Structures are given as structure tokens and as C-alpha cells.
Amino acid sequence: MYRLQISWSRIVPDGDGEFNEEGIAFYNRLIDDLLARGIEPMICLYHFDMPLNLAEKYNGFLSRKVKEAFVRFGQEMMKRFADKVKYWIVFNEHNLYFADGFEHYSGVLKKELTLSDMYTVFHHTMLAHCELTQFLHENFEAKIGGMLATTEIYPATFSPTDNLYLRKFDEFYNRN
């Protein structure tokens, strides 16, 4: 198995316009080469590569318009490659969109961020994930899932307080 990411910015440079056929041809050749060598490809549709135009114009996944543009991109990639690729990931490390620093992964350029902004980004990315999952299941014989970030953590001491903090952090960060 070989996991690759199709760069949204390479395929749709402005994020919501025309598809770059040269970029699609590159990934088509890559997938064919993997399969010819007996290597099963797994496609990730988003690995922190928000098209700059969408970040500047709409503040990334804070906008439902960006969610819609991403779903359009994802559906097109599925139409192009799902006959050859049986394993899909929508968002790399999707749980990071619901944690401190979410703006770095979601194309948000806004300086003053609120808790509501984080909820909005997570809501829009979850909607995109659900829409693409439904699209894939309704149209192709393929599997789709998520990719979560985890962090190995240890208590500073053996004290009950440090261990309680560790459990709370682990539950929120690694298991949400």
C-alpha cells in the first residue's frame, strides 16, 4: 500500500475554477505505475494544501463556499480514479481541525480567531467528509475513512495530578 495525496492546488490552481488536465495526467500515470508494480494506492484528498486564492478570498474552511469547492474537487478525483483506487482518505489528521492551531491546516488567514471559528471549520470539514463519503459509496466500490493525528505523551511526574492531566489531554487530543 502506498498513500499519496492529490494536491488540490495542483489540480485546481485557484481552488474553484478549471481542472488542470496536466496535473490529473500526472496522478493518473503515478497510479498506473504503482498498480503495474503490484502496489495498492491510497488517495488522501487534503493534506493542508488550501489553494491560496480560497484562503485569501474566503478564509479557507471558515467559508461554506470553500467546503463546496473542495467537495467538487473531491468528487472529480473520485470520478477520475475510483475505478483504479479502492482506498480513500478525505482529510489528513482531521482531528487537528478541532484543536489549537486549526487555522494552519484549514487555510484560515484571519488573525483574531474565536472558538466559534474553530467549530465552523470543523463543521464544514465534517460536512465535506460526509458528502464525499456518501458520493463514493453511492457510485463506486471503494473504501473511505479518516486519518487521525496522535501524540504520545507521558506525565511529568508520577503524581496523581500529572496523571489526571495526562488522561484528560490524551482523551481530548488523541481520542476526540
Go through each PLM region and give its residues.
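Catalytic domains of carbohydrate-active enzymes, especially glycoside hydrolases
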Residues: 1-7, 40
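Non-catalytic scaffold segments within catalytic domains of secreted glycoside hydrolases
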Residues: 11-176
